[in-house]
Regions:
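C-terminal motif of bacterial Sec signal peptides marking the signal peptidase cleavage site
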Residues: 19-23
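Bacterial N-terminal signal peptides that target proteins for export
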Residues: 2-11
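Bacterial signal peptide processing site
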Residues: 25-27
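Short, glycine-/small- and polar/acidic-enriched structural segments
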Residues: 31-182, 189, 196-202, 213-218
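Periplasmic-binding protein-like
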Residues: 48, 118-127, 214-241, 293-294, ...
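Pocket-lining segment of extracytoplasmic ligand-binding domains
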Residues: 100-101, 182-277
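Secondary-structure end/capping motifs
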Residues: 242-325
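Conserved C-terminal helix/tail region of periplasmic/extracytoplasmic solute-binding proteins
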Residues: 313-345
Length: 345
């Protein structure tokens, strides 16, 4: 191609603009001369293999490249609640999702802060369709299947029962919690009579209900004690937050991009989660309804002041104090201590 002199300036301008756009789009990611990719913050581990549908922002941030855009080479790992606490405390895991199960651990010295809200309710308690259990009062003396002691279903059940005057403490014997490694095993145990109730992450609870073989006796998204509140928060390692606050800010940016994308594209989000086998989804239409019910906050909602993270932290601190799960004498001060607002670009 021959470039005439009078066209050279235009050509140079177009080339400069193209290079500028490329540079702006990859400010946190670059390619080395060897052809490998370099990330601003390098490789990090994030728990994201528990199979819960509500973990959608983690899966979508990974699959849509939002983590990479913010400068992270993310390795999704499996991690129970204790592994998460240890990782957060020593800084090897910078951020995790979890409910108020971490509040007592913070009081006991685990160095972690609530930095954002992730979504609304995602847990259901189901019983066989012919079970006599219908209300919380019927739970006394019963066996409840959970995924792990100290995990979210266990903590939710504990708060719900304690508010009704039924002790969830093992030494009192009002109820018995039995851990199972898989939600399907919980359902089988409930069906066989090995346990009376299965406390399940979505989508298993809703799938069980739709089968007609089980009834839902508790829904975290609609129960008066939990409805409209974040059941799951994002927790940042205090060690990382203090030494590299911009790292946590960038991680939150990735999560928020994912939340916004899911809110605007629930059907596509479910397709990705199903195709990549992050969660067991046989009924995509049901899964889509559940994803919408989690009310992932959009960027516009955040900009208009729709966030209520601090208020929800204070609510659950107060509730946990009321049932004796927190020792603090000043719930408001403790709530302010464990929540830290992070500026996100």
């Amino acid at each position: 191609m021959i470039i005439r002199k009078k066209d050279f300036g235009i050509f140079a301008l177009i080339l400069a603009l193209a290079l500028g756009v490329t540079a702006c789009g990859s400010k946190n990611v670059s390619n080395t001369s060897e052809g490998t990719t370099q990330y601003k913050y390098g490789k990090i581990d994030i728990p994201g293999k528990d199979g819960a549908l509500c973990g959608a922002p983690i899966y979508i941030a990974y699959e849509k490249g939002f983590f990479a855009e913010e400068g992270f080479d993310v390795n999704l790992i499996s991690a129970d609640s204790e592994t998460r606490k240890i990782g957060l405390n020593n800084g090897t895991i910078p951020i995790v999702n979890g409910d108020f199960q971490f509040f007592p651990s913070i009081e006991e010295g685990v160095k972690v802060k609530v930095v954002d809200g992730l979504h609304n309710g995602c847990i259901k308690f189901v019983v066989p369709k012919d079970s006599p259990i219908k209300t919380v009062e019927d739970f006394k003396g019963k066996k409840i299947a959970i995924d792990e002691v100290g995990g979210t279903p266990h903590q939710v059940a504990s708060l719900w029962l304690e508010k009704a005057g039924i002790s969830a403490k093992p030494q009192d014997g009002d109820v018995t919690f039995l851990p199972y490694s898989d939600g399907n095993l919980e359902l089988e145990a409930a069906k066989s009579g090995e346990v009376d109730v299965a406390a399940l992450w979505d989508p298993l609870g809703s799938i069980a209900e739709k089968s007609g073989d089980y009834r839902v006796v508790f829904d975290l998204s609609t129960d008066p004690a939990f409805a409209g509140k974040y059941c799951c928060f994002l927790y940042a390692s205090s060690k990382v937050l203090d030494s590299e606050p911009e790292k946590i800010s960038s991680l939150l940016s990735a999560y928020r991009k994912a939340q916004n994308w899911i809110a605007e594209n629930p059907k596509e989000a479910v397709a990705i989660i199903s195709d990549k086998k992050y969660s067991a989804i046989d009924d995509k239409e049901l899964a889509e309804k559940l994803v919408v019910s989690y009310a992932y906050p959009t960027i516009k909602e955040r900009e208009s002041g729709g966030s209520h993270v601090a208020e929800d932290v204070k609510y659950f601190v107060t509730e946990l104090k009321n049932i004796g799960y927190l020792k603090t004498d000043d719930p408001d001060a403790f709530a302010n201590q464990i929540y830290q607002k992070v500026e996100v670009k």
